[in-house]
A protein has these predicted regions:
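Low-complexity, acidic/polar, glycine-enriched regions of mature
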Residues: 1-181
Length: 181
């Protein structure tokens, strides 16, 4: 079994949510870590773990980012990280998988199923073995205590409950250190 570590320079942990029902706001986490224990070309026996620092959330708008970090949403002061740990992985064929796991946000843990597409393995310019993945899914933010909501004068919802997850990840194979005598 090999260990693969997320390459933070070549990974994006993103999300999209409807704003005012008519447009979409995108954001991402910039500080995170994760690993895969197993074979990236056959995830069915792999174990995947991941964490992200809530304080690293960014949507390109400082005021909105501050609101997301507040107790109205993620409450970063009391819940500084979100985490994911896989519990089951099923192959769908054509390098596609359904990865089920436990997602924890604000001390609330719920099962989530993600769609994972394995992009392949290559050696990079530095001789490292790298695996690529595209991961998508959806959560209902209300289920994790991200419950702030408002309604416009016309009765429109300001922030939708469903949040799309979009992750493009590269993982680097960890080289085993030789035992010293």
């Amino acid at each position: 079994m090999s260990t693969w570590i997320i390459d933070t320079a070549h990974t994006e942990i993103g999300f999209k949510v409807k704003h005012l029902v008519i447009s979409t706001v995108s954001g991402k986490f910039t500080k995170f870590e994760g690993k895969l224990e197993g074979d990236p070309a056959d995830l069915t026996n792999a174990q995947i773990t991941f964490t992200a620092d809530i304080d690293s959330i960014t949507t390109g708008n400082e005021q909105r980012d501050g609101h997301l970090k507040s107790a109205d949403f993620f409450d970063a002061a009391n819940h500084p990280k979100l985490s994911f740990k896989s519990t089951a992985i099923v192959g769908k064929g054509d390098n596609e998988y359904k990865v089920t796991g436990d997602l924890t946000i604000r001390n609330t843990t719920k099962p989530i199923t993600l769609n994972v597409e394995f992009g392949g393995v290559q050696n990079d310019l530095y001789g490292q073995t790298v695996a690529g993945f595209e991961i998508t899914g959806k959560i209902n933010r209300q289920e994790y205590g991200l419950s702030w909501s408002a309604v416009t004068e016309a009765g429109g919802i300001v922030v939708a409950d469903d949040v799309k997850l979009i992750i493009n990840a590269e993982l680097v194979k960890k080289v085993k250190e030789a035992a010293t005598a």
